[in-house]
């Protein structure tokens, strides 16, 4: 009796009553703001905290938010209420491919809204975007600038910069204090050399650092409400890059074929719409991180997964040794096309590294009411105005798709035999590091060719060893969560990544590396 009275008094006490009332009110408000879901739409996953729960979790956990939802509910598609809006989260590979092929799902609204936040361009240019045909022409120019011939030229120019670096390594070798920062800085300049030509504005260590400060702060530019110090550093780095690009764009001649078509085409489109001088640099900054922020961390993880496994190194060396041409003057020529055609283990190992580190979240807006269909023939209704997110990291980690060892690097995974047609189809659909559909990354072949060429030279020409000789500590570092503003995870602590020592291999002491791609040579 006393216990019952005590409980009654507790429940009737003012703080408890107010707390219960607040919870009830929050619940009712949450239901009032909650978007309605049609019976044909994907089922709704309500947040544990009404209204703000999913939004807060997604901002805090980024791509890991979707992995947690998948682990808890394991649904192929779901409606996730974000504040008062609908977001469809798709994690089934076949549904994702159905969405990529659906013309009623568009990336363009994200491009317009995100571009102004990322670049900070003024309202006058935003008006040009909204009222002219510049955006479709701009997107088309990106694909026109990455046709096979243009990609071959990008490959050779970028790898020429790489070869100058590794050709300079003497017989006593080279010690690298931080493997990640070495690869990051080397390949950032190499990529920009290929894009911007002999007057490349991104050569100084300070501007390279600015590119990565800008890239790291992209999420803060999108929301402007978190961490003002990081936001301020990001804006300052962005401005320095914009000034360098603005000066370069002002002086760039439209007929200068030493500049990549990828850049010339899009600058030409903007000039046709009256954008000149510094404004070109202000806009160009919005894409400068694209060819670096994903391919370079991928190279790092590929490098670490391969060179920390001596057995994989030996297998890959045996494969690539047959595709190089050794000249009488110590020149060693690597043809990128031969790697693509004759080095299946190299390609498999790269895809495996990409699968493990890539957490790309693809965004679309539903422009008109439409449906997408899964492998069992079931269709789901998607309502106009809703957003769609397709987190590749969930598919890349799926044990259903990749097997029980999905979390483990296995260099030959993409050479697996004996898969059923259904398993093979699922794997093809599930690997989406470059997105898909009309907006698949136009520079994907450039990104992979850079990596294949560089790794071939390292495998054949150099022994890659831990600086201190401790092989047990020479391993891939812990991986950070992938932010939704980029696609590839970085090391959790970039500054503490292990060092590497490169020593020329016996028989390759004087090798001078050259690269060929298609009919393009250095």
Swiss-Prot record:
Its EC number is 1.-.-.-. GO terms for cellular component: membrane. The chain crosses the membrane at residues 10-30. Keywords: Glycoprotein, Heme, Iron, Membrane, Metal-binding, Monooxygenase, Oxidoreductase, Transmembrane, Transmembrane helix. Heme binds at residue 441. Its cofactor is heme. It is found in: Membrane. Pathway: Secondary metabolite biosynthesis. Glycans are attached at residues 104, 155. It is a single-pass membrane protein. It comes from the Eukaryota. It holds the Pfam family p450. Cytochrome P450 monooxygenase; part of the gene cluster that mediates the biosynthesis of the lipopeptide fusaristatin A. Fusaristatin A consists of a polyketide chain linked to three amino acid residues glutamine (Gln), dehydroalanine (dehydro-Ala), and beta-aminoisobutyric acid. The biosynthesis starts with formation of a linear polyketide chain by the highly reducing polyketide synthase PKS6. The gene cluster does not contain an acyl-CoA ligase or an acyl-transferase, and it is therefore predicted that the polyketide is transferred directly to the nonribosomal peptide synthetase NRPS7. This is Cytochrome P450 monooxygenase FGSG_08207. It comes from Gibberella zeae (strain ATCC MYA-4620 / CBS 123657 / FGSC 9075 / NRRL 31084 / PH-1).
